[in-house]
Amino acid sequence: MSAFVIDAFEFSRLKERREGAIPVTDLTRLADELADSSGTLHWTLTGGANHTDHAQLTLAVTGQLQITCQRCLTPFAFDIDSESVLILARDEAAADEIDALLDDDQIDVIVGTKTLDILQLVEDEALLAMPLSPKHAVCPDTSALEALKSGKKESPFAMLKNLK
């Protein structure tokens, strides 16, 4: 069994804890969404039980990603600092039942397995933490940058001379 594949219920029952770091390039679904796939995500997974004695996993993911601003189309750094609580259910029916009992949007219920891939959970968490439409707080002025690069600024009235 891979070091990143766990028996989710046993991991929770034993209150185990694992942590690590993974290069963003190893997370293909995430890398496809980024301006640059450099960087590393740090993660911590802790097993346990919630107040109703259901098996639970707590996943924390931190790191910095390079994403593209949807306004100016330039890359910028986005910090991820996300933590999720995942309650484990034996099957879909039990997951629906537990979800209805908890009535808490901050807690997700998933179907646990004996072969749960930690890295897939980390990648899912990072994807969910990204903004739907990423934007700078204040975009850099790219028009001034382009004018400097070209060296010559065209007059806004230049096209009027062709109207004669």
What is the predicted function of each stretch?
Residues 65-68, 135:
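Secretory pathway export signals and precursors
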Residues 69-72, 139:
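Short cysteine clusters
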Residues 1-15, 77-164:
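Charge-rich, low-complexity linker and terminal segments
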Residues 33-40, 64, 71-90:
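Mature extracytoplasmic or otherwise solvent-exposed domains
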Residues 35, 68, 149-152:
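Alpha-helical protein-protein interaction elements
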Residues 1-66:
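A positional/architectural concept
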